[in-house]
Amino acid sequence: MAHKKGASSSRNGRDSNAQRLGVKRFGGQLVKAGEIIVRQRGTHFHPGDLVGRGKDDTLFALAPGHVEFGRKRGRRVVNIVSADTERAEKAAVPA
């Protein structure tokens, strides 16, 4: 019988912290400038109108407005529809 524990027991016992990736603000939600919309590795979502991209591919709002998810040329795109744009669209549509 062995008088020692398994030799690898002290080499185990570590785990990496979660990266907390994913969508932080969903479609229709109101955001302020600078708020993070999506944390990602690689460009799963691409920046659209009024959305910036950080060096770690994080998408963030460049202006206040509502978040809008869509597709452009087969890519998933995140846009910000500003309050000014919404007002202009409502004024242009006859009631």
UniProtKB/Swiss-Prot annotation:
One of its GO terms (molecular function) is structural constituent of ribosome. Residues 1-21 are annotated as: Disordered. GO terms for cellular component: cytosolic large ribosomal subunit. Residues 7-19 have a biased composition (Polar residues). The keyword Ribonucleoprotein applies. The keyword Lipoprotein does not apply. HAMAP family: Ribosomal_bL27. This is Large ribosomal subunit protein bL27. It comes from Parafrankia sp. (strain EAN1pec).
